[in-house]
Structures are given as structure tokens and as C-alpha cells.
Amino acid sequence: LRLNNDGQPDPLSGKPYSSRFVTECITQGARRFGWSRRSHAPGSMTAPNGAQVGWGMALGNYPSPMSPAIATLRIGANGRTRITVSGHEMGQGIKTTIANTLLQGLDVDPNGLEVVIGDTSAAPQHQTGASCGTAGCVPATLKAVRRMQAALQELMDGRSVPGNIHRQLATIRRPYLQVEVSEVAPGQGAEAIEYLRVSGDGAAGPEYPEFTSMSWIAHFVEVRVEPTTRRIRMPRCVSVVDCGRVISPRTARSQVHGGVVWAFSAALREATEIDPRYGGYLNCDLAEYLIAVNADIGEIEVGFVYKPDPLANSAGLKSLGEVVMAGASAAIANAIFHATGKRLRSMPFRIEDLL
């Protein structure tokens, strides 16, 4: 059904997507999961221990905005490299991603590399949110790398000096080389940088002048419903993402793992209880606010389409953090229906809903 109804233009703006590899997400996820072995009838799959087995899938998408950013890169003859970027750590391992981007383009000592983020005295900082951390930091970092390559080539003026950049600078008795760059989203001008300096904002997207930029994900999940307690567990999940170029596969995979756990917990555990008399929260600690635990979730397999999006930004990447949450809860609901024949439409899905 999904493969036969894959719409390409953005239904809201009518503009084409910058990239949309939903078909690849679905086919790769189905192959990894073994979707072809699925029995279609609800309640038709049973585990050896008597648990009802359900397989479900769903798609998710999320806007891919971009924040303007400033990056300053300094390489010294003393073996030190320092890059300051507009951006900060939101849990995705952004320092690792920035370092990977820099080290892929410049021959510098990684042991002497310092990545400075979240410091307004070094660079203006944008908002925390909207999955635009990497999409802001990395294009600016990549631009700084290319500017440094050009500056180094001009400085060397055709001379061939052995060794890495630190050794080359030391050989020609240059204490350091520094560049500063700024990067804006498609369709933005220099005023976006000034707005960033003043307000700490200035993000654009997902609708740009010529296109709309979105990230996409396909989730395939298996749930097992215990026959007596009706407790729901998820022994495995396969999630395949179209997020453009993947700069740091290890940290990107970790983001998807965390997002799937977040989605499972939201779908089956988490809910705030409000006092109807006074409006206060009744479950404001982890003793009362239920969350997922290790026993609830088994293997989480993550895949990427690995196709850069050259329209979205100079780095070819799109947002990743929050797209993982989109669609995962729906896939779990579909799997519960496949296991039990009950269509649950209000989260969290709890044991009492299956009694």
C-alpha cells in the first residue's frame, strides 16, 4: 500500500522535496526485518511460550530546518587545532560530528583538536531544538574546512612541504593560520547572520524558496503480548532513515536507538496524571511516571539510505533527532493490532486496554 501510493510533491506547498527516498527506506527495512514472512490475519502468529506475536510498520517524517552559523578555524604550528562553531550539545554527539567533518578534509593531529560549542563568547548560538543542530554546525564546519584548504594552498604558493599542516606551518615559520566563515540556509542572505548575533535565532525551513526539505523513516516492529498478564514487549525493531549524508554513523545510529526507546516508552508507558481539582501533576517522579526498561525492548537494528541531499545544504545532510519518534508509535500500534485484533488509538497503550 505504501509503495503504491508514494506521493512526491509537498501537499502543503506544492513544491518538490529536496530529496525523498521513502521507497528505499521501506524496501530496505522490509528486507532486514523479514516482512515477507508475515502472516496477514490478526492473531495468527504465536510464540512458543504462547505469547501473541504482532508485526507492524509505519512511516514517519519530520521537517529539516537549518540554522545560520559562524565557524572560526585556527590551525597552529604547535600541533593544536581549534574550531569554534555556532551550536551546542543536545545529546547527539555534535562534537564528534564536527571533528569527523574537519578531519575528513584536513590533515591535522586529532589529539590536538579542540571543538568549542555552546560558548557565546566564541560564536553566537542558535536555539536548542527543531533537529537543526547538525544541519547548522556541519555546513559551517565544512565551509571552514574548504576555506582553510584554499588559504593553505595560497600560503604554500606551489611549494611542496612534507608532513601534516602543523609541520608545514612550522617549516615555513608561520605560527598559525586562521579563517572565519558564516553559512546560511537556502534563500537566506547576510541578514540572517546579523539576526543570529542579536537574537540567537534565524532558522529557516522546512519550506525553502524552491523546495521543501524533510527527513523520512520507516519502522518495522515486532511485539509480543503475554497470554496471562497481557504485558507488551518489543523484542526487535528495524528502523531505516533517509536523513541525507550521514557524517558520523556511530553517533547517528545512537540517536536512532534513543529515539526508538523514546517512542516505545511514549506508546506504552508514559502519561502525566493531572489532579482534576487543582490542576497539579500527580506523578512527578520516576516512582509514579512509568518509563520503559531494558526488559521491555530487545534488538534495535538501524539502517540508513546514505544518499546526500545537495539541495538542503552544502553538506548534503538533513535532520535526524526527532524524525525517529515520528511513526514509531504508529508501528507499535499496528503490531499490537496484528497480534490481538484490537485497534488502540489512544496512547499510552496499557495492559487494561487489552483485557
Where are these regions (language model features)?
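A generic structural motif
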Residues: 87-89, 243-244
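Thiamine diphosphate
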Residues: 94-102
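Short acidic alpha-helix initiation/capping motifs at coil-to-helix transition points
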Residues: 92-95, 328
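Conserved beta-alpha junction segments in alpha/beta enzyme cores
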Residues: 54-80, 85, 92, 206
